[in-house]
Protein backbone atom coordinates (compact mmCIF):
# COMPACT_ATOMS: atom_id res chain seq x y z
CA UNK A 1 0.00 0.00 0.00
CA UNK A 2 1.29 3.52 -0.70
CA UNK A 3 2.72 5.60 2.16
CA UNK A 4 -0.14 8.10 2.17
CA UNK A 5 -2.70 5.30 2.53
CA UNK A 6 -0.70 3.80 5.39
CA UNK A 7 -0.55 7.18 7.10
CA UNK A 8 -4.30 7.60 6.76
CA UNK A 9 -4.93 4.21 8.31
CA UNK A 10 -2.46 4.93 11.12
CA UNK A 11 -4.59 7.90 12.13
CA UNK A 12 -7.70 5.76 12.53
CA UNK A 13 -7.43 5.00 16.24
CA UNK A 14 -7.32 8.67 17.15
CA UNK A 15 -9.98 9.71 14.68
CA UNK A 16 -12.42 7.02 15.81
CA UNK A 17 -12.27 8.10 19.43
CA UNK A 18 -15.89 9.00 20.32
CA UNK A 19 -14.98 12.55 21.37
CA UNK A 20 -13.28 13.20 18.04
CA UNK A 21 -16.22 11.87 16.06
CA UNK A 22 -18.60 14.15 17.93
CA UNK A 23 -16.20 17.12 17.92
CA UNK A 24 -14.14 17.09 14.70
CA UNK A 25 -11.93 19.92 15.93
CA UNK A 26 -10.56 17.62 18.65
CA UNK A 27 -8.82 15.48 16.04
CA UNK A 28 -5.44 16.72 14.89
CA UNK A 29 -5.95 14.99 11.54
CA UNK A 30 -9.63 15.40 10.57
CA UNK A 31 -10.78 12.83 8.03
CA UNK A 32 -13.92 13.68 6.12
CA UNK A 33 -14.26 10.01 5.10
CA UNK A 34 -15.23 9.27 8.70
CA UNK A 35 -17.69 12.16 9.02
CA UNK A 36 -20.18 11.26 6.31
CA UNK A 37 -23.14 13.24 5.06
CA UNK A 38 -25.31 10.52 6.60
CA UNK A 39 -24.51 7.35 8.56
CA UNK A 40 -23.79 4.44 6.24
CA UNK A 41 -26.34 1.62 6.37
CA UNK A 42 -24.90 -1.91 6.48
CA UNK A 43 -26.51 -5.23 5.55
CA UNK A 44 -25.11 -8.75 5.88
CA UNK A 45 -26.21 -11.56 3.55
CA UNK A 46 -25.70 -14.90 5.28
CA UNK A 47 -26.18 -16.23 8.80
CA UNK A 48 -23.98 -19.29 9.24
CA UNK A 49 -21.38 -19.22 11.98
CA UNK A 50 -19.03 -16.92 10.01
CA UNK A 51 -21.86 -14.77 8.63
CA UNK A 52 -23.31 -14.31 12.10
CA UNK A 53 -19.88 -13.52 13.54
CA UNK A 54 -19.23 -10.81 10.94
CA UNK A 55 -22.74 -9.44 11.53
CA UNK A 56 -21.96 -9.29 15.26
CA UNK A 57 -18.76 -7.33 14.58
CA UNK A 58 -20.36 -4.72 12.31
CA UNK A 59 -23.35 -4.37 14.64
CA UNK A 60 -21.01 -3.64 17.55
CA UNK A 61 -19.29 -0.99 15.47
CA UNK A 62 -22.63 0.51 14.46
CA UNK A 63 -23.31 1.09 18.16
CA UNK A 64 -19.78 2.30 18.88
CA UNK A 65 -19.69 4.71 15.90
CA UNK A 66 -23.20 6.14 15.50
CA UNK A 67 -21.98 9.12 13.50
CA UNK A 68 -20.51 6.75 10.92
CA UNK A 69 -22.97 3.83 10.71
CA UNK A 70 -26.74 3.46 10.98
CA UNK A 71 -27.78 1.89 14.27
CA UNK A 72 -29.62 -1.16 12.94
CA UNK A 73 -27.83 -3.80 10.87
CA UNK A 74 -29.94 -6.23 8.84
CA UNK A 75 -28.78 -9.83 8.48
CA UNK A 76 -30.48 -11.96 5.85
CA UNK A 77 -31.35 -15.38 7.25
CA UNK A 78 -32.49 -18.38 5.25
CA UNK A 79 -35.65 -19.11 7.18
CA UNK A 80 -35.92 -22.48 8.89
CA UNK A 81 -37.80 -23.90 11.85
CA UNK A 82 -36.05 -24.76 15.11
CA UNK A 83 -38.40 -26.76 17.35
CA UNK A 84 -41.35 -25.16 15.57
CA UNK A 85 -40.10 -21.56 15.80
CA UNK A 86 -38.65 -19.50 12.96
CA UNK A 87 -34.92 -18.99 13.27
CA UNK A 88 -35.34 -15.26 12.57
CA UNK A 89 -37.75 -14.96 15.50
CA UNK A 90 -35.30 -16.74 17.78
CA UNK A 91 -32.44 -14.45 16.74
CA UNK A 92 -34.54 -11.30 17.16
CA UNK A 93 -35.97 -12.25 20.56
CA UNK A 94 -33.20 -14.27 22.20
CA UNK A 95 -30.37 -12.45 20.39
CA UNK A 96 -28.61 -15.71 19.67
CA UNK A 97 -28.23 -17.84 16.55
CA UNK A 98 -28.87 -21.09 18.38
CA UNK A 99 -28.26 -23.26 15.31
CA UNK A 100 -25.10 -21.85 13.76
CA UNK A 101 -23.46 -19.85 16.57
CA UNK A 102 -24.88 -21.19 19.85
CA UNK A 103 -23.82 -19.69 23.14
CA UNK A 104 -22.83 -16.31 21.69
CA UNK A 105 -24.90 -13.26 22.60
CA UNK A 106 -25.65 -11.01 19.64
CA UNK A 107 -26.14 -7.22 19.72
CA UNK A 108 -29.75 -6.10 20.00
CA UNK A 109 -29.33 -3.82 16.98
CA UNK A 110 -28.70 -6.85 14.73
CA UNK A 111 -31.98 -7.67 12.99
CA UNK A 112 -32.60 -11.04 11.32
CA UNK A 113 -34.62 -10.62 8.11
CA UNK A 114 -35.95 -13.58 6.05
CA UNK A 115 -36.67 -11.56 2.88
CA UNK A 116 -33.39 -10.86 1.11
CA UNK A 117 -34.63 -7.84 -0.85
CA UNK A 118 -35.92 -6.23 2.34
CA UNK A 119 -32.70 -7.11 4.14
CA UNK A 120 -30.52 -5.09 1.74
CA UNK A 121 -32.98 -2.26 1.05
CA UNK A 122 -31.27 1.10 1.49
CA UNK A 123 -27.89 -0.44 2.29
CA UNK A 124 -24.78 1.54 1.42
CA UNK A 125 -22.65 -1.59 1.90
CA UNK A 126 -23.62 -5.25 1.57
CA UNK A 127 -21.41 -7.89 3.19
CA UNK A 128 -21.82 -11.25 1.45
CA UNK A 129 -21.05 -14.19 3.74
CA UNK A 130 -22.59 -17.51 2.74
CA UNK A 131 -21.52 -20.76 1.03
CA UNK A 132 -20.51 -19.73 -2.45
CA UNK A 133 -22.58 -22.37 -4.23
CA UNK A 134 -25.65 -20.36 -3.18
CA UNK A 135 -24.36 -17.10 -4.64
CA UNK A 136 -25.94 -17.39 -8.13
CA UNK A 137 -29.43 -17.80 -6.68
CA UNK A 138 -28.91 -14.92 -4.26
CA UNK A 139 -27.64 -12.57 -6.98
CA UNK A 140 -30.58 -13.48 -9.19
CA UNK A 141 -32.96 -12.44 -6.40
CA UNK A 142 -31.10 -9.18 -5.79
CA UNK A 143 -30.70 -8.14 -9.42
CA UNK A 144 -32.59 -4.92 -10.07
CA UNK A 145 -33.00 -4.18 -6.36
CA UNK A 146 -29.51 -2.84 -5.57
CA UNK A 147 -28.50 0.69 -6.67
CA UNK A 148 -25.23 0.99 -8.61
CA UNK A 149 -23.87 3.25 -5.87
CA UNK A 150 -24.04 0.42 -3.33
CA UNK A 151 -20.69 -1.15 -2.38
CA UNK A 152 -19.98 -4.72 -1.30
CA UNK A 153 -17.47 -6.92 0.50
CA UNK A 154 -17.30 -10.64 -0.21
CA UNK A 155 -16.38 -12.97 2.65
CA UNK A 156 -17.10 -15.96 0.39
CA UNK A 157 -14.46 -18.61 -0.17
CA UNK A 158 -14.33 -20.05 -3.67
CA UNK A 159 -14.13 -19.39 -7.38
CA UNK A 160 -16.59 -19.45 -10.26
CA UNK A 161 -15.54 -21.80 -13.03
CA UNK A 162 -17.23 -22.09 -16.42
CA UNK A 163 -16.31 -22.65 -20.06
CA UNK A 164 -15.03 -19.08 -20.29
CA UNK A 165 -12.53 -19.41 -17.45
CA UNK A 166 -12.20 -18.74 -13.74
CA UNK A 167 -13.56 -15.71 -11.89
CA UNK A 168 -13.23 -14.30 -8.40
CA UNK A 169 -16.54 -14.28 -6.55
CA UNK A 170 -16.11 -10.55 -5.96
CA UNK A 171 -15.98 -10.16 -9.74
CA UNK A 172 -19.16 -12.22 -10.11
CA UNK A 173 -20.92 -9.92 -7.65
CA UNK A 174 -19.66 -6.85 -9.51
CA UNK A 175 -20.79 -8.15 -12.89
CA UNK A 176 -24.20 -9.40 -11.77
CA UNK A 177 -25.19 -6.40 -9.65
CA UNK A 178 -23.11 -3.67 -11.29
CA UNK A 179 -21.54 -2.60 -7.98
CA UNK A 180 -17.96 -2.39 -6.69
CA UNK A 181 -16.96 -5.32 -4.49
CA UNK A 182 -13.91 -6.08 -2.35
CA UNK A 183 -13.00 -9.11 -0.25
CA UNK A 184 -12.37 -10.06 3.38
CA UNK A 185 -10.34 -13.09 4.40
CA UNK A 186 -7.84 -14.07 7.05
CA UNK A 187 -6.90 -16.46 9.82
CA UNK A 188 -10.44 -16.38 11.12
CA UNK A 189 -12.03 -19.31 12.90
CA UNK A 190 -15.52 -17.96 13.58
CA UNK A 191 -16.14 -19.47 17.05
CA UNK A 192 -12.92 -17.96 18.42
CA UNK A 193 -13.69 -14.49 17.06
CA UNK A 194 -17.32 -14.65 18.18
CA UNK A 195 -16.11 -15.22 21.75
CA UNK A 196 -13.84 -12.19 21.56
CA UNK A 197 -10.52 -14.00 21.20
CA UNK A 198 -7.96 -11.80 19.45
CA UNK A 199 -7.58 -12.31 15.71
CA UNK A 200 -6.66 -10.34 12.60
CA UNK A 201 -7.95 -10.23 9.06
CA UNK A 202 -7.32 -8.64 5.67
CA UNK A 203 -9.81 -6.50 3.78
CA UNK A 204 -9.05 -5.83 0.12
CA UNK A 205 -10.79 -3.02 -1.72
CA UNK A 206 -10.04 -0.88 -4.74
CA UNK A 207 -11.82 2.45 -4.73
CA UNK A 208 -13.97 2.37 -7.91
CA UNK A 209 -13.91 4.85 -10.77
CA UNK A 210 -17.33 6.20 -9.75
CA UNK A 211 -16.20 6.97 -6.18
CA UNK A 212 -18.21 9.96 -4.99
CA UNK A 213 -15.67 11.35 -2.55
CA UNK A 214 -14.90 11.29 1.20
CA UNK A 215 -17.98 11.35 3.38
CA UNK A 216 -20.21 10.45 0.46
CA UNK A 217 -19.02 6.93 -0.31
CA UNK A 218 -17.42 3.83 1.19
CA UNK A 219 -13.62 3.89 1.16
CA UNK A 220 -10.76 2.11 2.94
CA UNK A 221 -10.99 4.16 6.11
CA UNK A 222 -14.70 3.44 6.40
CA UNK A 223 -14.09 -0.27 5.87
CA UNK A 224 -11.46 -0.36 8.58
CA UNK A 225 -13.82 1.46 10.92
CA UNK A 226 -16.58 -1.03 10.10
CA UNK A 227 -14.66 -4.26 10.70
CA UNK A 228 -11.96 -3.30 13.22
CA UNK A 229 -12.61 -4.29 16.85
CA UNK A 230 -10.31 -4.53 19.87
CA UNK A 231 -10.36 -8.32 19.36
CA UNK A 232 -10.45 -8.27 15.54
CA UNK A 233 -7.66 -6.26 13.92
CA UNK A 234 -7.96 -5.28 10.28
CA UNK A 235 -5.43 -4.42 7.59
CA UNK A 236 -6.85 -2.85 4.41
CA UNK A 237 -5.03 -3.40 1.12
CA UNK A 238 -5.72 -3.17 -2.63
CA UNK A 239 -5.15 -6.81 -3.62
CA UNK A 240 -8.65 -8.21 -4.07
CA UNK A 241 -7.38 -11.03 -6.30
CA UNK A 242 -4.70 -12.21 -3.87
CA UNK A 243 -7.00 -12.15 -0.85
CA UNK A 244 -9.74 -13.99 -2.75
CA UNK A 245 -7.49 -16.71 -4.19
CA UNK A 246 -5.81 -17.37 -0.86
CA UNK A 247 -9.20 -17.63 0.82
CA UNK A 248 -10.50 -20.07 -1.76
CA UNK A 249 -7.57 -22.44 -2.25
CA UNK A 250 -6.65 -22.83 1.43
CA UNK A 251 -9.77 -24.98 1.81
CA UNK A 252 -8.47 -27.47 -0.77
CA UNK A 253 -5.20 -27.71 1.14
CA UNK A 254 -7.06 -28.14 4.44
CA UNK A 255 -9.02 -31.06 3.01
CA UNK A 256 -5.72 -32.74 2.09
CA UNK A 257 -4.31 -32.02 5.56
CA UNK A 258 -7.37 -33.76 6.98
CA UNK A 259 -6.57 -36.82 4.87
CA UNK A 260 -3.06 -37.25 6.30
CA UNK A 261 -4.25 -36.40 9.80
CA UNK A 262 -6.90 -39.10 9.56
CA UNK A 263 -4.23 -41.66 8.69
CA UNK A 264 -2.22 -40.61 11.74
CA UNK A 265 0.84 -39.53 9.76
CA UNK A 266 1.65 -36.70 12.16
CA UNK A 267 2.69 -33.07 12.00
CA UNK A 268 5.56 -33.56 9.56
CA UNK A 269 3.19 -34.85 6.89
CA UNK A 270 0.72 -32.05 7.53
CA UNK A 271 3.50 -29.47 7.20
CA UNK A 272 4.58 -31.03 3.89
CA UNK A 273 1.05 -30.76 2.51
CA UNK A 274 0.79 -27.14 3.67
CA UNK A 275 4.12 -26.23 2.07
CA UNK A 276 3.11 -27.70 -1.28
CA UNK A 277 -0.34 -26.13 -0.95
CA UNK A 278 1.14 -22.67 -0.47
CA UNK A 279 3.39 -23.12 -3.51
CA UNK A 280 0.48 -24.23 -5.69
CA UNK A 281 -1.71 -21.38 -4.45
CA UNK A 282 0.94 -18.81 -5.38
CA UNK A 283 1.53 -20.52 -8.74
CA UNK A 284 -2.23 -20.47 -9.45
CA UNK A 285 -2.36 -16.74 -8.70
CA UNK A 286 0.65 -15.93 -10.88
CA UNK A 287 -0.64 -17.96 -13.82
CA UNK A 288 -4.26 -16.89 -13.89
CA UNK A 289 -4.59 -13.54 -12.05
CA UNK A 290 -1.87 -11.11 -13.11
CA UNK A 291 -2.91 -8.42 -10.64
CA UNK A 292 -2.50 -10.68 -7.59
CA UNK A 293 0.41 -9.58 -5.39
CA UNK A 294 2.69 -12.33 -4.06
CA UNK A 295 3.33 -10.38 -0.84
CA UNK A 296 -0.31 -10.96 0.08
CA UNK A 297 0.31 -14.71 0.38
CA UNK A 298 3.33 -14.33 2.67
CA UNK A 299 2.71 -11.10 4.55
CA UNK A 300 -1.03 -10.87 5.17
CA UNK A 301 -3.42 -12.67 7.49
CA UNK A 302 -5.29 -13.69 4.33
CA UNK A 303 -2.23 -15.62 3.15
CA UNK A 304 -0.03 -18.06 5.01
CA UNK A 305 -1.58 -17.20 8.40
CA UNK A 306 -5.02 -18.24 7.14
CA UNK A 307 -3.55 -21.38 5.61
CA UNK A 308 -1.98 -22.39 8.93
CA UNK A 309 -5.15 -21.70 10.91
CA UNK A 310 -7.44 -23.47 8.45
CA UNK A 311 -5.16 -26.50 8.36
CA UNK A 312 -5.01 -26.61 12.17
CA UNK A 313 -8.74 -27.14 12.54
CA UNK A 314 -12.05 -26.16 11.02
CA UNK A 315 -14.62 -27.96 8.96
CA UNK A 316 -12.48 -28.91 5.94
CA UNK A 317 -9.88 -30.69 8.08
CA UNK A 318 -12.68 -32.43 9.98
CA UNK A 319 -14.24 -33.70 6.77
CA UNK A 320 -10.93 -34.90 5.32
CA UNK A 321 -9.98 -36.60 8.57
CA UNK A 322 -13.33 -38.38 8.83
CA UNK A 323 -13.09 -39.55 5.23
CA UNK A 324 -9.65 -41.05 5.93
CA UNK A 325 -10.73 -42.66 9.18
CA UNK A 326 -13.98 -44.18 7.91
CA UNK A 327 -13.60 -44.47 4.14
CA UNK A 328 -16.92 -42.68 3.64
CA UNK A 329 -17.67 -40.25 0.81
CA UNK A 330 -17.14 -36.50 1.15
CA UNK A 331 -20.85 -35.68 1.08
CA UNK A 332 -21.57 -38.22 3.82
CA UNK A 333 -18.83 -36.77 6.03
CA UNK A 334 -20.11 -33.25 5.43
CA UNK A 335 -23.66 -34.22 6.35
CA UNK A 336 -22.62 -36.03 9.51
CA UNK A 337 -20.19 -33.44 10.87
CA UNK A 338 -21.26 -29.95 9.86
CA UNK A 339 -24.80 -29.40 11.18
CA UNK A 340 -26.17 -28.30 7.81
CA UNK A 341 -23.17 -26.15 6.87
CA UNK A 342 -20.84 -26.69 3.92
CA UNK A 343 -17.25 -27.80 3.48
CA UNK A 344 -16.03 -25.27 0.94
CA UNK A 345 -13.01 -27.46 0.26
CA UNK A 346 -15.18 -30.10 -1.40
CA UNK A 347 -16.81 -27.61 -3.77
CA UNK A 348 -13.60 -25.72 -4.54
CA UNK A 349 -11.63 -28.92 -5.17
CA UNK A 350 -14.07 -29.82 -7.92
CA UNK A 351 -14.08 -26.30 -9.39
CA UNK A 352 -10.28 -26.13 -9.48
CA UNK A 353 -10.10 -29.52 -11.19
CA UNK A 354 -12.61 -28.44 -13.84
CA UNK A 355 -10.74 -25.21 -14.50
CA UNK A 356 -7.29 -26.83 -14.69
CA UNK A 357 -8.72 -29.46 -17.03
CA UNK A 358 -10.09 -26.73 -19.31
CA UNK A 359 -6.71 -24.97 -19.51
CA UNK A 360 -4.69 -28.21 -19.68
CA UNK A 361 -2.69 -27.47 -16.51
CA UNK A 362 -3.53 -30.44 -14.27
CA UNK A 363 0.05 -31.72 -14.15
CA UNK A 364 1.33 -28.41 -12.77
CA UNK A 365 -0.82 -28.72 -9.65
CA UNK A 366 -0.31 -32.26 -8.29
CA UNK A 367 -1.66 -31.57 -4.78
CA UNK A 368 -4.85 -29.92 -6.01
CA UNK A 369 -5.41 -32.76 -8.48
CA UNK A 370 -4.59 -35.48 -5.94
CA UNK A 371 -7.10 -33.95 -3.54
CA UNK A 372 -9.74 -34.05 -6.26
CA UNK A 373 -8.99 -37.66 -7.21
CA UNK A 374 -9.11 -38.77 -3.56
CA UNK A 375 -12.37 -36.88 -2.99
CA UNK A 376 -14.20 -37.71 -6.21
CA UNK A 377 -12.14 -40.38 -7.97
CA UNK A 378 -10.48 -43.66 -7.07
CA UNK A 379 -7.09 -42.46 -5.83
CA UNK A 380 -6.00 -43.65 -2.37
CA UNK A 381 -4.84 -41.31 0.36
CA UNK A 382 -1.91 -43.62 1.03
CA UNK A 383 -0.50 -42.79 -2.42
CA UNK A 384 -0.42 -39.03 -1.77
CA UNK A 385 3.37 -38.84 -1.09
CA UNK A 386 4.12 -40.48 -4.45
CA UNK A 387 1.90 -37.96 -6.23
CA UNK A 388 3.95 -35.09 -4.79
CA UNK A 389 7.40 -36.40 -5.73
CA UNK A 390 8.13 -33.42 -7.99
CA UNK A 391 8.12 -31.15 -4.96
Swiss-Prot record:
Q: Which InterPro entries match?
A: 6-PGluconate_DH-like_C_sf, 6PGD_dom2, G3P_DH_NAD-dep, G3P_DH_NAD-dep_C, G3P_DH_NAD-dep_euk, G3P_DH_NAD-dep_N, NAD(P)-bd_dom_sf
EC numbers on record: 1.1.1.8
Q: Which GO terms describe its cellular component?
A: cytosol; nucleus
Residues the entry annotates as binding NAD(+) = 46-51, 78, 134, 190, 315, 344
Alphabetically list the UniProt keywords.
Answer: NAD, Oxidoreductase
Q: Which residues form the active site?
A: 250
UniProt-recorded Gene Ontology molecular function terms: glycerol-3-phosphate dehydrogenase (NAD+) activity; NAD binding; protein homodimerization activity
Entry protein name: Glycerol-3-phosphate dehydrogenase [NAD(+)]
Provenance organism: Candida tropicalis
User: Gene behind this chain?
Assistant: GPD
